């Protein structure tokens, strides 16, 4: 793939606010390339700092303007087709229920597989939930983020369900739950 063709194609998507791509997205965007050629082209684009490999199979277009939700966009791309929402320590720190703010970590509940993904922007920690979709939708709110955000009581319940450490919880803030 020619570098200029790649930049022009990726620029079109970035103008629509899209800057995080799964390998399968790129395979569809550059369908004239064989998988082997595409992998070699992606390596060249990463080596020339046009793309950054966020995690296995997920790439971020460096020339695109980015919002403050890059980890959430990466999460959505990693677990496309699954329900995912910010919860646990990340949500509770936003609500002021726990005393420490996780600076380099995003904690997310997902109906997909759990796992930890180290990216150049921080760590994404995915924890599997078997909660029904209706419970997930009722226990979350829409924000400016590309993925939903747990309500305070949902995040607290998730923290207790998965057996996480609760010693950072500010009990004075729990009275509002």
Write out the residue ranges for each language-model feature.
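Short beta-edge/loop segments at beta->alpha junctions of small alpha/beta modules
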Residues: 2-79
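Nucleic-acid-binding surface
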Residues: 62-177
